[in-house]
C-alpha cells in the first residue's frame, strides 16, 4: 500500500508532465503557424491576381485565390462585391467562372489562375488578402486603395474629367465681370513724391526702430483730437481746393493692413484746406488703443484724388466723386467737397474690409502718403511709465542724502566758477582767495557764532571802525588747515553730513538764558557827534509831570524793573521807535508778558479759593 504522501507526490508529477506537454504542443503549433505565414508571404507575388473590373455596372465580380501548396486543405474563397452588400466565401463544390482579360475562352470545372503583368498588378482595385487562420476577410487599407484608385485607367479618366471641370468653373483665372484681386501696399512704395507731412501734433515723441530704421513715434491720447498737416509739392499735380481727401487707419506692418472693425470706425476726422490749396489740415480722433491691438503702432494713410476721379466700389462698379458742394454718402466714406478756394472735408470711414483699397476707394491716378507712426494711450500718465516695466526702486534715507549732497556739490561748483569769473573781471588774483570746504571743528564753531558759516565776514573779527575785516582775516578764515584731522576719514560723505546735521540741531535746541541790554555799554561805544544827536532826540520828547514826580519819589528802580509806570521803560520805548536800525528785545513785550503772567497767577488763585 502506498502512503498518502506518495500518492500526492505522484499526482503532482503527473500534473507537471501534463503541463509540459501542453506547453510543447502550443509552441510547436505557433512555430508551424509562423513558418506557414513566412512561406505564404514569400509566395504572395506568385499568387493569381484579379482582372480589372468591367465598366461600372451593378454586377457581381468573382474574385478567386489559389491555395498555398503547404497547407493541409485547399480552400477557394470567392468574394462577390456589389454596390451595397458583400457575400460570404463559397464552398469548394461550386465552380466559379472567370473571364480572362486577354479574350480567351473560360474553362469550366476548375479554377483558372490569372497571371497579371506588372502594369495590371498596380491597376487592381481590391488588394490581396493574406491567409490568416480563424479570421475573416479584412477591408483593404486606405493607402493601397488610394494608390490603386490613382493608377486605375478608369480613375485616371475620371480625374482628368474632374480637372477639366475645375478649370472651367474657376472664376479667378477667367476674365469677366468678377472683381480683380486687391493690391497690397508697403510703407516704402505708398508715399507719393508730390505730398509731404509738414506737421503732426502729439503729446510726446519717442524714438523706436521700425524695419531696421529709426522712427519717431508720436504718442496721442484716445478720443483726443490732434492735427495732421500735409502739403502739396506741385500745385499742378495736386491742388487741395479741387481734390477729394480721404484717410484711413493702418497697422505698422508689411504689407500694410487696415484696422478692421464691426460697427464703429476707429478714426474720425475733419479737414480743411488753405486758400491757394497748397496745404491741408486734418483734425483726427482715434477711438482705439494700441494695447487693445497687441501693442501695434498705427499709420494714418491720407489719399488725395481729383474730384472727377473714377473709383471702384466693393461691388466692382465704378463710381464718380461729385464735383458740387453737396454732401455725398457712400459705403466707405461721407465727404463734402467745395469748388471754392477754401474746401472742407468731413469723413468718417465706415468700411468693414481689411484691404487697403476699401477705405481709399480705388487709387486710380490718386496720391497717398503715410503719417508718422502713432501709439495711442488712454491717459497722459501712461507716458511716464517705463515700457519695459521696470519699477522705480524705493530710496532709503542714505540715498536721499547722497542725492542732496550731489546737488549741493554741483551748486558749489557753479558758484565757485562764478566767483572766479568775478575776481578775474576785477583784476584780483584767485590765489588770494581760497574757497575751500570747511572742516568739522570750524562748522561747529560757526554754529555758535552770530554769522552764518558760509559768509566770509565775521562780526566778532577785529577789523576797522566800519566793521569790515582785513584781507588777511578773510584768507585765514577760508584757507584749508594744513594739519587735517583723521576724524571721519573712513566714513562716507552721507554719514558725516548726518553727524554734522545732528550737532546743529543740538545747538539750536539748547535753552539760552535771558540777556539784559546794558545802556552804559551802548552809550560808551558812541562818538561825540552821535551822543549830541541822542541828546537832541531825548530833549524833543515830552513826559508827563506825574511820571516825573513818581520817578523822583521812587529812587529804588533797578534795571530789571517790572513796574507798569516806570519812566525808564517809557523813555526806552520812545528811543526804540526813533532808532529802528538797532535791534534789541523790546521792554514793552517784557512788560506785557509780565502783566499776563501776573493776571494768570491771580486767576489761578481765585480759582483755588472758589474750589475750597
Swiss-Prot record:
Compositional bias of kind Low complexity: 58-102, 143-169, 323-359
Compositionally biased intervals (Polar residues): 103-113, 129-138, 175-185
Region (Disordered): 46-113, 129-185, 313-360, 457-488, 593-612
Coiled coil: none
One GO term describing the cellular component: nucleus
GO BP: positive regulation of DNA-templated transcription; sorocarp spore cell differentiation
GO MF annotation: an example: sequence-specific DNA binding
PANTHER family: C2 NT-TYPE DOMAIN-CONTAINING PROTEIN (PTHR38092:SF6), REGULATOR CUDA, PUTATIVE-RELATED (PTHR38092)
Protein name: Uncharacterized protein DDB_G0287317
Species this chain originates from: Dictyostelium discoideum (Social amoeba)
Amino acid at each position: 500500500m502506498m502512503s498518502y504522501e506518495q500518492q500526492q507526490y505522484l499526482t503532482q508529477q503527473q500534473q507537471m508532465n501534463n503541463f509540459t506537454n501542453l506547453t510543447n504542443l502550443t509552441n510547436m503549433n505557433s512555430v508551424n503557424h509562423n513558418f506557414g505565414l513566412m512561406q505564404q508571404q514569400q509566395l504572395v507575388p506568385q499568387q493569381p491576381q484579379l482582372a480589372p473590373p468591367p465598366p461600372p455596372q451593378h454586377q457581381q465580380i468573382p474574385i478567386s485565390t489559389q491555395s498555398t501548396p503547404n497547407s493541409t486543405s485547399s480552400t477557394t474563397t470567392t468574394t462577390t462585391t456589389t454596390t451595397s452588400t458583400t457575400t460570404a466565401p463559397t464552398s469548394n463544390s461550386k465552380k466559379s467562372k472567370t473571364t480572362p482579360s486577354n479574350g480567351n475562352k473560360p474553362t469550366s470545372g476548375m479554377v483558372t489562375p490569372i497571371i497579371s503583368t506588372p502594369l495590371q498588378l498596380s491597376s487592381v482595385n481590391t488588394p490581396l488578402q493574406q491567409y490568416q487562420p480563424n479570421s475573416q476577410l479584412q477591408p483593404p487599407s486606405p493607402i493601397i486603395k488610394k494608390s490603386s484608385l490613382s493608377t486605375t485607367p478608369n480613375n485616371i479618366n475620371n480625374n482628368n474629367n474632374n480637372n477639366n471641370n475645375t478649370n472651367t468653373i474657376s472664376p479667378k483665372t477667367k476674365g469677366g465681370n468678377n472683381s480683380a484681386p486687391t493690391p497690397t501696399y508697403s510703407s516704402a512704395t505708398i508715399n507719393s513724391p508730390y505730398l509731404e507731412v509738414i506737421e503732426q501734433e502729439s503729446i510726446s515723441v519717442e524714438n523706436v526702430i521700425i524695419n531696421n530704421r529709426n522712427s519717431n513715434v508720436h504718442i496721442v491720447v484716445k478720443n483726443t483730437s490732434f492735427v495732421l498737416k500735409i502739403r502739396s509739392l506741385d500745385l499742378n499735380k495736386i491742388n487741395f481746393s479741387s481734390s477729394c481727401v480721404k484717410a484711413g487707419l493702418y497697422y505698422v506692418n508689411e504689407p500694410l493692413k487696415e484696422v478692421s472693425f464691426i460697427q464703429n470706425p476707429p478714426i474720425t476726422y475733419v479737414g480743411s484746406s488753405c486758400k491757394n490749396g497748397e496745404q491741408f489740415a486734418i483734425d483726427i480722433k482715434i477711438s482705439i488703443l494700441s494695447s487693445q491691438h497687441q501693442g501695434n503702432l498705427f499709420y494714418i494713410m491720407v489719399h488725395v484724388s481729383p474730384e472727377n476721379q473714377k473709383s471702384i466700389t466693393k461691388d466692382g462698379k465704378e463710381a464718380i466723386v461729385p464735383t458740387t458742394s453737396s454732401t455725398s454718402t457712400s459705403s466707405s466714406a461721407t465727404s463734402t467737397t467745395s469748388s471754392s478756394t477754401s474746401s472742407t472735408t468731413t469723413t468718417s470711414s465706415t468700411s468693414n474690409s481689411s484691404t487697403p483699397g476699401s477705405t481709399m476707394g480705388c487709387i486710380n491716378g490718386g496720391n497717398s502718403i503715410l503719417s508718422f507712426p502713432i501709439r495711442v494711450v488712454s491717459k497722459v500718465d501712461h507716458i511716464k511709465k517705463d515700457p519695459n516695466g521696470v519699477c522705480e526702486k524705493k530710496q532709503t534715507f542714505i540715498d536721499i542724502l547722497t542725492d542732496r549732497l550731489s546737488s549741493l556739490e554741483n551748486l558749489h561748483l557753479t558758484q565757485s566758477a562764478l566767483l572766479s569769473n568775478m575776481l578775474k573781471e576785477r583784476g584780483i588774483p584767485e590765489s588770494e582767495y581760497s574757497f575751500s570746504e570747511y572742516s568739522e571743528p570750524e562748522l561747529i564753531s560757526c554754529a555758535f557764532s552770530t554769522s552764518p558759516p558760509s559768509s566770509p565776514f565775521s562780526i566778532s573779527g577785529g577789523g576797522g571802525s566800519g566793521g569790515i575785516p582785513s584781507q588777511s582775516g578773510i584768507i585765514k578764515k577760508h584757507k584749508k588747515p594744513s594739519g587735517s584731522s583723521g576724524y571721519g576719514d573712513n566714513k562716507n560723505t552721507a554719514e558725516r553730513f548726518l553727524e554734522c546735521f545732528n550737532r546743529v540741531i543740538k545747538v539750536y535746541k539748547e535753552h539760552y538764558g535771558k540777556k539784559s541790554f546794558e545802556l552804559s555799554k551802548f552809550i560808551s561805544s558812541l562818538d561825540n557827534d552821535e551822543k549830541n544827536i541822542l541828546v537832541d532826540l531825548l530833549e524833543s520828547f515830552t513826559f508827563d509831570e506825574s511820571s516825573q514826580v513818581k520817578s523822583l519819589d521812587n529812587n529804588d528802580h533797578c534795571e530789571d524793573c517790572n513796574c507798569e509806570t516806570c519812566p525808564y521803560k517809557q523813555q526806552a520805548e520812545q528811543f526804540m521807535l526813533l532808532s529802528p536800525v538797532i535791534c534789541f528785545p523790546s521792554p514793552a513785550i517784557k512788560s506785557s508778558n509780565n502783566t499776563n503772567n501776573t493776571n494768570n497767577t491771580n486767576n489761578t488763585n481765585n480759582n483755588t479759593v472758589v474750589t475750597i
